[in-house]
Amino acid sequence: MQERLKELQNKIGYRFRDEELLISALMHSSYTNEKHIPKHKCNERLEFLGDAVLELISSEFLFFANRKTPEGELTRMRASMVCEPSLAFCAREIGLGEYLLLGKGEETTGGRKRDSVTSDALEALIGAIYLDGGFANAKEFIKNFVLNDLENKKLFYDSKTILQEMVQGVHGNQVLYKLVKEEGPDHNKSFTVEAYIGDALYGEGTGRTKKAAEQEAAYHAILKYKGNKE
């Protein structure tokens, strides 16, 4: 366990003074339930805190980076940047899923790659860094792993808009999103959506909401569509 923690800290470029905070950030509720650990020890409280820290820092970034942009557009941009699919994308770049502490059920059903799980863990990690190292270190982490390479990330977090513009510009076709699977209890649903251009299937996505699943399906559709044109 210690080697894994060290490896993750090397990846993110931050060394925890209190590694218990890092462990808590990686601990999913399925793990605490299975191991009979008190519920408050899982990463949900840190996720709550990290969400607030992320919103403040991303708001500050957008405020100064877009000095003439009106409030409504800034709000839309922030919502896109910190939505579940976007944060899951950032978590995948770090490989965060492989370090999570999951219960056996969550593990066997693909929890390490589930957007809802990895995006929540990323926010929990932000909360843990904030508590351990303060605002400046949390800001540095967000700058390096969430606000970095925004041009390429825009392809992901605004995929539906980009795909529609690409398709209309060439074929005048509409993109159709089809819900093909809905599973799980009401408090933890998972949706699977397919993206079609004309009659052809171009992408599939899974998310905790239909919108998140559509965004991921659109992202994969863009990659396939661009590949077909090359």
Spell out what each predicted region is.
Residues 1-230:
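Double-stranded RNA-binding/processing signature
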